[in-house]
């Protein structure tokens, strides 16, 4: 069955099976002499109200405030762990190779907290490392290390460049390193700031301590159970100084003690 509707010159043919909108077939004939159809403009307004926009922006702001600090912390932690692992490997390999070349570290001279001994150690290590900058004993312009570092968990500050016997330099990977003899034994004290003078300049966040045990011929991160600053009391503990964090980072590959 078919019905024909005629409205002025508009004709639509609709069969009983054509009631779905997609099946409506409409046509019209132009009046005599007409060349086009003048249809009234159709206005469609789409948009959000000011209240809706403000609510959406508020939600975005809350989500950003929650997620962005977490993302930044995660990135910083991964970068620090990776840099410390890399620098530890560089120093261990340099010491090992230099001992093969010049003899065991204990035979390089009498270990002491003197500028001369620190420079001697550096000169023996230098051929086996990619050094970017040499600051030496005096680093008043803070080209390698900052002048002052905060202790972990707001425990105050410690001077650094004022401790003159340390011989300081930076590696191509961005880490700053200082070497210093220890007069009481054949050990060597080595400190690493994984991002040089850049902040945060906090013990246990970017500054980490090591010793080289000449008898064991091993670079030991401060914080190992037998060290003078075990990591459980000098890193993980809420009142820890940060002196023992190197061992924690290298062992667990994270910095969860900051959370």
Protein language model features and the residues they cover:
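Alpha-helix exit/C-cap motif
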Residues: 92-111, 131-134
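Intrinsically disordered, low-complexity segments enriched in proline/serine/threonine
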Residues: 23, 42-43, 71, 223, ...
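Intrinsically disordered, low-complexity regions enriched in Pro/Ser/Thr/Gly and acidic residues
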Residues: 115-259
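Long hydrophobic alpha-helices with heptad-repeat/coiled-coil character
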Residues: 58, 64-74, 90, 243-259
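Aliphatic-rich helix starts adjacent to a transmembrane/signal segment
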Residues: 70-91, 95-98, 102
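N-terminal leader/signal peptides at the extreme start of proteins
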Residues: 1-48
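Intrinsically disordered, low-complexity coil segments
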Residues: 36, 109-117
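N-terminal single-pass transmembrane signal-anchor helix
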Residues: 29-31, 44-76
């Amino acid at each position: 069955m078919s019905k024909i509707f005629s409205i002025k010159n508009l004709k639509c043919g609709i069969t009983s099976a054509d009631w779905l909108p997609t099946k409506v077939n409409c046509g019209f004939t132009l009046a005599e002499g007409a060349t086009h159809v003048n249809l009234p403009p159709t206005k469609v307004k789409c948009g959000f109200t000011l209240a809706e926009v403000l609510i959406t922006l508020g939600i975005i702001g809350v989500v950003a405030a929650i997620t962005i600090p977490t993302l930044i912390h995660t990135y910083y932690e991964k970068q620090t762990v990776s840099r410390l692992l890399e620098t530890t490997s560089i120093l261990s390999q340099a010491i090992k190779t230099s001992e093969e070349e010049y003899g065991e570290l204990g035979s390089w001279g009498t270990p002491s907290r003197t500028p001369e001994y620190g420079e001697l150690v550096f000169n023996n290590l230098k051929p086996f490392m990619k050094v970017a900058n040499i600051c030496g004993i005096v680093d008043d312009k803070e080209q390698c290390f900052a002048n002052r570092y905060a202790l972990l968990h707001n425990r105050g500050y410690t001077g650094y460049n004022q401790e003159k016997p340390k011989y300081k330099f930076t590696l191509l990977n961005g880490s700053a390193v200082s070497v210093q003899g220890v007069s009481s034994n054949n050990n060597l004290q080595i400190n690493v700031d994984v991002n040089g003078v850049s902040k945060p300049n906090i013990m246990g966040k970017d500054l980490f301590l090591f010793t080289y045990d000449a008898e064991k011929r091993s670079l030991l991160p401060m914080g190992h159970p037998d060290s003078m600053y075990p990591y459980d009391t000098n890193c993980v503990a809420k009142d820890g100084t940060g002196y023992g964090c190197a061992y924690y980072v290298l062992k667990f590959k994270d910095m969860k003690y900051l959370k």
